[in-house]
Amino acid sequence: MDTAEIRSRFLNHFARRGHTVVPSASLVAQDPTLLLVNAGMVPFKPYFLGDLPAPWPRAASVQKCVRTVDIENVGHTARHASFFQMCGNFSFGDYFKAEAIPFAFELLTEGFGFKADDLWATVYLDDDEAEGIWRKLLPAERIQRRGKEDNFWSMGVPGPCGPCSEIYFDRGCAYGREGGPIADEERYLEVWNLVFMQYERGEGAGYDYPIERELPARNIDTGMGLERMATILQGVDNLYEIDISRPVLDAAGRLTGRRYGADPADDVRLRVIADHTRTAAMLISDGVVPSNEGRGYVLRRMLRRAIRNARLLGAHEPVMSELFAVVGSAMGTIYPELLDNAETITGVAVAEEQAFAETLRTGTTIFDTAARQARSLGSTTLGGEAAFKLHDTYGFPIDLTLEMAAEAGLSVDEAGFRRLMDRQRQAAKADRAARRIGNVDLSAFRPILARSGPTTFTGYEELSRTSGVVGLVGIADGAGLAAAGEDTEVGVVLDATPFYAESGGQEPDLGRLRFDGGEVEVLDVQRPVPDLVLHRVRVLGGELRLGVEVFAEVDADRRRAVSRSHTATHLVHTAFRRALGEGATQAGSLNSPGRLRFDFHALGAVPPSVLADVEDEINEVALRDLPVRAFVTTQEEARRLGAMALFGEKYGDAVRVVDVGDYARELCGGTHVASSAQLGAVKLLSEASISAGTRRVEGLVGLDAFRYLAREHLLVSQLSTALKARPDELVDRVTDIVGRLRDAERELERLRAAAVLAGAGALAEGAEEVAGVAVVTAEVPAGTAPDDVRLLALDVRGRLAGRPAVVAVAKADGSSIVVVTDDAARGRGLRAGDLVRQSWASLGGKGGGKPDVAQGGGGNPQLVPAVFARLRGLVAEHASR
C-alpha cells in the first residue's frame, strides 16, 4: 500500500466519522514558543488551551513536522527522521475514549488490514476506563499498564494533560523477545498514540506536577506516524526505504557512486543525505531560507550536512539540483507546491551548495591541520581556538566541527569555544547599531570623534535645537562625505542632538533636520560607537553640507507615545515582580509608539487571573498620577536606594535612575512621561513562552489601548444585540446556543438514520433470489451519512436471517458503497471484500474490506447500476459452483 493510499484511507476513515479534514499547516510555527511545527497537534494548540474556540467539534489532519533534537541519530536507526508526517484525529469536547479507541482499532484492522492478534495496547496505570474499552477489542493479556513517563501526556507547562493509550504492532519473534511493549519495543512497534486530555496540571518539573482538576470539556489528540505506518505496510526495514523516500536514497547512491546496502557505513551517509534533502525541500517550500539563526539555521544545517556527506561518499559535482527534483517527483502528488515552486525551491538549495563548497574545502583543510597538531602534542582534544577559527573565519557551524572531531576520534574544547564566542558577541554588541544602519566600517567615526568630540544629547530637556553638522558618512560604505544631494541617504553626526538613539529596548526618535535651502527626514538614530550619535537621513530638498547649521526637530507625538510605552514597561516589570516574586526580572523589552513588549524570567505560564491582577495594578498606579523623576547618582547609591538593574547590562560609575513615585525605581537611560497619569491606560494582550524559563507579554499603551478597548466594547455590544443578552450573560448564552446546536445536530443525525432504516423491511421483502442466495441492492440519497449506509446494509442482512444473503447499499452519487454477507453466503464463497474488489473496484472505484463487511469509494452515479448488475453476476457465478 503506497503512502498516498495510507494517507487517503486515514483521512477518509475519519471523514466518514464526522471529522472535518484540515489541511496541513505550514512548517513555520505560529506558536511563538516553537521555531517549527514538531507535532501533529501544534496547529490545534490554541483550541486545546482554550485560547480560541475550535471551529469544528472533530478534525483530522496529516501534518508536516520537523524535529531536529536527535538529528545525530538520523541515518543510524530505522526510526529517526528529521521530517515526518503525523496523521491525527482530534476531538474538541465532542467524543472521548469510548469512541477514540474503536476508531483507531477499526482503521488498523479494517482499513489497513492488521490482524487483531498482532496488536497490543498500553494504558496508563490507573486508567480503568481505557482498559475496559480495550478489553472489548483485545484479550486482557495483550493490554499492559505503564507509568507516567510512558503513558501520561502534558505540554510541559501548566494546562491540559491526561493519560494516553498506545497501540503496538508485534513484528514477530525474529525482532526480539516475547512479553509485549514493556519487554521489547524493538519487536513491538508503536503505531498510534491516543491522548485523552481530561485534566489540568499545575506547576512542576519533569513528571513531578500536581493534577489540579478535571477539565469541563475533554479532548482527544492522537498521532499516527505516516512514514512508520508505511514502513510496516510496505514490508521494508526502515522508513528510508518506503515509496516516498527510497527514490531519494537511490538518487543519492547514484550521484555518489555508492550502492545502498553494500556497506553499512556508506548506508548511514546515504540515509542522512536522503533525510536531510527531503526536510530541506519541505522547509524551503514553506518559505524558510538559509541563515545563521532560528529556523533558517535549521535549514542551513540540514543542507550542509547533506552536502558534506555527499562529498565524503565521493560526489565531486553539485548534487542538490537532482536530489531536489527527485524529492519533488516522489512527494509532489501529496504536496504539489514542491512541483509548482520547483525552480525557486531548487534555486535556494543550489545557491547554498555553491556557497558551502568553498567553505567545506577550506574548512576541512584547516580542521585536518588542527587535528594533526592536536595528535602531535599527544592530545585527544581539538582546542577551542581552532573550533572558533573554523566558525568565525570559515563559516563552519560548531555542530559540524563536533561531528568531524568525533569521526576523527577527538573531542572539542567546547567551553573554550563558548568563551571566545561570548567575547565576540560583546564586541559585536558595540557595533550592532552601526551595522543596522548600513555602516560596517567603524574607522570612519574615529576622525569625527577626534575632531569634534562626543555628541551631546539634549533630548531629556528639549525636542528641538540648532546644531552643527560635524560629520557626513555614506550609508553603503562608511566613507566620509563633504555633501549630500537631494534624494540620497547618508549618516549625519551633529555636535549636539535632541534625538534619542535606539537603546535599552526603546525605539529611536524620528523627525526632521532643516537648514538654509533644504530639509532632511530622520529615518533612524543609532550609536555606532560610544559617545557618538548617528542619524540616518534622507535628503528631501537642497544640498546638506558638512559644517552647516541645522534645526533639529524631534517628532513630538512619536516621542510622547514611545515614552508612554517605556514608563509603562517599568510598571509592568515591578508589577510582575510583586506578583510572581523577585525572580521575575526583565530579560528584554521593546518600547515602540503605543505598544510594549516585555520579556521576563519565569518557570511557567502566568495564570490568566494573575495577568489580570497585574494589569489592574498597573492601571491603578497610572490613575494615582505619580510623578516620574529621573536623576543621576552613583551605582552604589542607586543600589542603596533599591533601584533595579537589568541583568547583562553594563553600567558606569554614574547611573541614571528613574522613579515612578514610590512604586518603581530602575536604572534607565530612556525617555519617560512626567507623571503616571499620562499613560492613559495599559492593556496587556498576550503572554507566552519564548524560550525555556523566559516569558513574553505584549501590550498597548495610551490611545492605542483606548482604541483597542473601544473595539472590544463595540464587539461585545454587537454580540449582545445579536444574541439579545446583557454582556455578563454572553458566555452562558453562547454556551447554551452551542449546546443546543450540538443537540439539534445529533437529533438530525438520529432522524436521518431512522429515515434510512425505515426502508429496511421493504428492501428485505423485495430480495431477489439468485442461485439460492437472497440478493438486495439499494440506492440511498447522496446526503446519507456513511455510518447510516453501513447500518442499513447490516439491518437488511439481519432481516434475511436463515437465508444465504448478500446486501449492497450505495449512495446515489457513487461516492460510497457497502457490501455485507452472512455466514451462509460466505460458506458458498461469497466474501464481501472480494465482491467489492471484483465489482466496484474493477469498474473504476476503490475499495475492499473483510469477508463480512466491505466498502468502496471514489465512484460516480453511472457506476452504481453497473456495479449492482456485476454483483448479481458474481453471486450467480460463485453460488452455482
Swiss-Prot record:
Belongs to the class-II aminoacyl-tRNA synthetase family. The gene is alaS. This is Alanine--tRNA ligase. The lineage of its organism: Bacteria, Bacillati, Actinomycetota, Actinomycetes, Frankiales. The keyword Cytoplasm applies. Catalyzes the attachment of alanine to tRNA(Ala) in a two-step reaction: alanine is first activated by ATP to form Ala-AMP and then transferred to the acceptor end of tRNA(Ala). Also edits incorrectly charged Ser-tRNA(Ala) and Gly-tRNA(Ala) via its editing domain. Consists of three domains; the N-terminal catalytic domain, the editing domain and the C-terminal C-Ala domain. The editing domain removes incorrectly charged amino acids, while the C-Ala domain, along with tRNA(Ala), serves as a bridge to cooperatively bring together the editing and aminoacylation centers thus stimulating deacylation of misacylated tRNAs. The keyword DNA repair does not apply. It is found in: Cytoplasm. It is an enzyme of class 6 (ligase). HAMAP family: Ala_tRNA_synth_B (MF_00036_B). It catalyses: tRNA(Ala) + L-alanine + ATP = L-alanyl-tRNA(Ala) + AMP + diphosphate. Its EC number is 6.1.1.7. One of its GO terms (molecular function) is ATP binding. Its main location: cytoplasm. It comes from the Bacteria. SMART domains: tRNA_SAD. InterPro entries: aa-tRNA-synth_II/BPL/LPL (IPR045864), Ala-tRNA-lgiase_IIc (IPR002318), Ala-tRNA-ligase_IIc_anticod-bd (IPR018162), Ala-tRNA-synth_IIc_core (IPR018165), Ala-tRNA-synth_IIc_N (IPR018164), Ala-tRNA_ligase (IPR050058), Ala_tRNA_ligase_euk/bac (IPR023033), DHHA1_dom (IPR003156). GO terms for biological process: alanyl-tRNA aminoacylation.
